[in-house]
């Protein structure tokens, strides 16, 4: 995918915030120094995951750049739809931005029959923050017990033991979930899917041994 550099300036952020805060009158915002109060960055997943970590880095830099606190607000649920809905329907006097993902603004539109918001019309993109690869990991103790040292070993075991391995994801419809389903389809394997409210809790359970 070709990426175009985007410079995040006060004018750019002001225009995009006005578009996200759809009820805010543009003339008023244009005449007012922005922001005049703290700004909420909604992360539609649980703390500790990639989206949350990136949001906190961005919030720290924006706080220094604009002189007002940018505060991360985790609102997990429904594969990112819960937090996205909060920002889409934010009141005019609320400064709210969303740290969206390919899941919240791409996959969910196709996955859910009806969303309470329009991921295109109710938001204006500001900038691409990061491109994040998907990585498959297996609990270390489980890998040693099963003698799995490679992806090929993993596929061989999964094919021979359908349903005996479980797969944690950051939520139904997320990019991680879709990547896992694609892996199963491409390899002819079957693993039980357990959706979490973010990659942070999923990773903790995988390290703890309750997830493979």
Predicted feature residues:
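Short, polar/charged alpha-helical segment
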Residues: 48-67, 177-185
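Sec/Tat signal peptide C-region and signal peptidase I cleavage site
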Residues: 26-30
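Hinge/capping helix and adjacent helix->loop/strand transition within the periplasmic-binding protein
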Residues: 89-95, 110-201
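N-terminal secretory signal peptides
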Residues: 1-8, 15-24
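Short, well-ordered beta-strand elements
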Residues: 37-45, 71, 96, 164-168
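Extracytoplasmic "Venus flytrap"
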Residues: 41-54, 76-78, 169-174
């Amino acid at each position: 995918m070709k990426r175009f550099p985007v410079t995040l300036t006060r004018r750019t952020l002001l225009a995009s915030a006005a578009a996200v805060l759809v009820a805010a009158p543009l003339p008023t915002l244009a005449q007012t120094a922005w922001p005049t109060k703290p700004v909420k960055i909604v992360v539609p997943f649980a703390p500790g995951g990639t989206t949350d970590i990136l949001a906190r880095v961005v919030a720290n830099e924006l706080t220094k750049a604009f002189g007002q606190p940018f505060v991360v607000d985790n609102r997990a649920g429904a594969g990112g739809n819960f937090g996205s809905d909060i920002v889409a329907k934010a009141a005019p006097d609320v400064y709210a931005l969303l740290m969206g993902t390919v899941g919240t603004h791409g996959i969910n539109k196709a996955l859910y029959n009806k969303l309470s918001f329009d991921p295109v019309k109710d938001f204006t993109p500001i900038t691409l923050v990061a491109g994040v690869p998907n990585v498959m990991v297996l609990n270390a103790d489980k890998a040693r017990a099963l003698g799995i040292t490679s992806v090929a070993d993993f596929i061989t075991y999964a094919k021979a033991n359908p349903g005996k391995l479980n797969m944690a994801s950051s939520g139904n419809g997320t990019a991680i979930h879709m990547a896992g389903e694609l892996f199963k389809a491409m390899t002819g394997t079957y693993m039980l899917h357990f959706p979490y409210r973010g990659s942070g809790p999923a990773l903790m359970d995988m390290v703890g041994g309750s997830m493979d």
